[in-house]
Every structure is written in C-alpha cells, then in structure tokens.
Regions:
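Structural signature of beta-strand start/N-cap positions in the alpha/beta core
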Residues: 2, 26, 48, 105, ...
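N-terminal Rossmann NAD(P)H-binding glycine-rich loop of SDR-like oxidoreductase domains
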Residues: 3-25
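Conserved hydrophobic beta-strands of the Rossmann-like cofactor-binding core
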Residues: 3-5, 70, 106
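Conserved glycine-rich Rossmann-like NAD(P)H-binding loop of the short-chain dehydrogenase/reductase
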Residues: 25-32
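The conserved SAM/SAH-binding core of class I Rossmann-like methyltransferase domains
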Residues: 30, 73, 142
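NAD(P)H-binding glycine-rich loop region in Rossmannoid oxidoreductase-like domains
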Residues: 35-101, 112-115
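Glycine-/Pro-rich loop/turn segments that contact NAD(P) or position catalytic residues
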Residues: 76-153
Length: 153
C-alpha cells in the first residue's frame, strides 16, 4: 500500500516510518521543512518526501492522488492564543486534500482527555475529530496520553 505520513518529522512519525516500510508499504512523508528531515539510508527505497504545510493550500497540490491510506499526526504548536483555530484549519485542509485522492482509510492520533482537561482543549480536540470524520474515507481515531520517550523534548 502507498501510505501518506503527515507529521513524519515528529516524535511518532519518525518511529512509525520504519515500521510501515518494514511491513512492505511505500511511504510518502509530509514535512514542513525538507532541511529538518532525513530518511535513514535503509528506508530510502520505499520512501518519498514532499514539502507540505497544511496551512498553505498551494503546498497540498504535491500530495499524490494514488495513495491508499494516511496517518494524520499533525500537531500545531504555537504560543499564539489562536493555535486551536490553526489546528482546525490544518484538519480542514487535510480532509479537503485527502478527499481528492484514492485514500480509503485515515488514522488520526488524538489526545486522551480527562476530567482535568480544560473545556476549551476538550472541545478543540473533539472538533478536529469531527472535521476529519467528514471525509469520504474510513477514520480510525487513536486517543493517547502525553507521549515521552528517548529523543523527545
């Protein structure tokens, strides 16, 4: 299968890429900055890198039409108070672009929210799930807590 991996330069994306390749998939890695992402030599034969910023609709034209599945690992970090709107815009632009492809299944890695989560955070994450769920593909939502591991910062 040909898989689109958004957030490929992030903590989860870097660890998911080799697993996908080892399982026989061709992976298209979406990164905002080509200079900040290097594919390990042993994965290069099954990997392509495209520069995509989900806040820039023109950059979405580089997403191939013949992809079978996608992982949505986009997390927008900002000091700005409107980062929740930016996250929603990314999700909307992703869904719009993916609906123009052959994708049959999208996997979204969301947050596991609890009673201590703010209502604003809870609502914004749920809105992203709803937005992604409006696509013409099947959607799997994985909710996890904060992930910390080797190399995270």
């Amino acid at each position: 299968m040909k898989i689109l991996l958004t957030g490929a330069s992030g903590y989860i994306g870097k660890r998911l890429l080799p697993v996908l390749v080892q399982n026989g998939h061709e992976v298209i890695c979406c990164v905002r900055n080509l200079k900040r992402f290097t594919v390990p030599e042993h994965l290069k034969a099954s990997t392509n890198i495209i520069q995509v910023n989900f806040l820039d609709k023109d950059s979405l034209k580089s997403i191939p039409k013949d992809i079978d599945g996608a992982f949505y690992l986009v997390g927008y970090m900002s000091e700005s108070s409107d980062f929740r709107y930016l996250e929603l815009e990314c999700a909307y632009n992703f869904r719009t672009a993916i609906n123009k492809t052959n994708v049959k299944h999208v996997v979204y890695l969301g947050d596991l929210l609890n009673a201590q989560s703010s209502l604003i955070n809870l609502a914004s994450k749920r809105i992203i799930e709803i937005e992604l769920g409006r696509g013409k593909y099947n959607l799997t939502i994985l909710r996890c807590g904060f992930i910390i591991g080797s190399g995270s910062y």
